[in-house]
Amino acid sequence: MKVVRSTCNYCSIACNFDFHVNDNGFIERVKPSEDYPVNQGFCCVKGLNLDKQNTIYENPVLPLIRKENGEFEHISWDEAFKVFADKVKKIQDKYGKESFAFLSTGQLLSEEMALAGHIGRNFLGGNGDGNTRLCMATAVVAYKQSFGFDAPPYTLDDLEHSDVMIFIGCNPIVAHPILWSRVAKNENKNKKVIVIDPRKSETAVRADMWIDIKPKSDIRLLYTLANVLIEKGWIDEEFIKNSTEDFEGFKNHVKNYDINDVEEYTGISKGKVLELAEIIHKGEKVSLWWTMGVNQGFQAVRTAQAIINIALMTGNIGRPGTGANSITGQCNAMGSRIFSNTTGLYGGGEYSDVKRRKAIAEILEIDEELLPKKPTKPYNEIVDGINKVLNGTTNMNELNNKLALY
């Protein structure tokens, strides 16, 4: 029996486990790693069932190629690489470099994403995107527009230091149990947990305050809340002056969101909004958290920006226990965003950034001209490009049959 340490592949928390593997290669026991700083010996029920993923290959893993009769047969790796390379070259010679595209996922390792992006984008000059664009584009755009860089500014430890935690459109008790365990470890007896969600979720049940807004009214609530904080002077003027830009523009914009109208649009009473504003004001370390309820919602990017702006104008960022914090879903969605070479340069940065382009080219030891000069076509356009008259009922198998190589 040997013990192999590895990372859970179910969600973005990335818990570590000790897998007890017998001589036949089967996992007999799964135990969360006690000395790993992320899960600290805890896990959810999904992690405890990782042994159910056991896959034993009796024969060497070889590529399969479809024969003319429609059946698959094994071929060698060398032959598979040659067939693939030859077909890609013929397609690009006939239709141009952008006729090639790849689709990836947040389930890949960062190194695999980087390699796919290196080959597909740098050397083949094609398009490529991941399904992480479909779920996380809201947060990506909001962070880039607010900070100039896509990087959620938090660690799980912040949950143990916050005295006010506001969860917007997320249900961590179910979706991110280990993240919620850090809330439970917070020893501040006066801490406040607030949930903004139309649903009375499991997290809402456990919250000190549940704000059951009407669907599509997040942005109205957040702008009204921001206006209240500004009017009452419950903002960090020094931080705003030293660390932000165009606060006056935001201030003038949210003036249009009168608290006397808030109940009509959101279903939340004036008194409750004032109470929330006061809780934020009195909190020394306020953190705001969101996930798919915002990212897949109405006016999603603006909603995420409003969350970030509330954190900025109250000075709740850049300190332990604070932050405007987007929670990802897939186990390596963040790796896809940073290292896939699809919407920006490796490690972050725009394709138009001359200094960054030069630095990346030197690291990769390639000609700078090989680096893309613009972002890829997005996931949906790649799929739509297979069939210009695509409609919602078109089956993916029908689309695949239209491809010269799939």
Give the positions of each predicted feature.
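Flexible, glycine/charged-enriched surface loops at secondary-structure junctions
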Residues: 95-99, 235-240, 287, 318-325
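A glycine-rich, hydrophobic/aromatic-adjacent loop/helix-cap motif
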Residues: 281-403
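Glycine-rich phosphate/diphosphate-binding loops that line cofactor/substrate pockets in enzymes
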Residues: 80-100, 155-163, 253, 274-287, ...
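Glycine-rich anion-binding loop/nest that anchors nucleotide
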Residues: 163-188, 290-291, 374, 386-394, ...
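N-terminal export/assembly segments and adjacent metallocofactor-ligating motifs
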Residues: 1-232, 243, 269, 346, ...
